[in-house]
Amino acid sequence: MNVSQTIIACPQCRARNRVALNRLDERPRCGKCGAALPPAAGDRPVAVSDATFDREVFASSLPVLVDCWAPWCGPCKAIGPVLDELARAYRGRLKIAKLNVDDNPRTAATYGIRSIPTLLFVKNGQLVDTQVGAPPKNALVQRIEQVLLS
């Protein structure tokens, strides 16, 4: 797959569909069953929970950046708009997920989240990097590029 395409799983039949990035706004349909495909990862961060974490993060066809956050956390609020911007910039190449650690303690405990924000970088179903704290945007972009190229 080249960087001008992404893969979207069909919610009906689970078939994996290769979609050109420049056609994501055309409401693509599944090639197998014809069902409408969900919006591609990357338009905006997706909320994940204890129940959906493995499916959304570890089963993703794209690398995933997970923002472990809480609503009362100042640095978490500061990095939120940066992650929204990066979600648009890396659309179709990187999925950005947000895990509210207050509402999802099981997943937070599983990954040893003790400070927030904590960013988890997952690629090919494996945790490949972790960042504790809210890095500046340029440092975060460098880290994302390293993960994408690895």
Where are the predicted features?
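Proteins that catalyze or organize thiol-disulfide redox chemistry
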Residues: 1-65, 70-95, 103-106, 110, ...
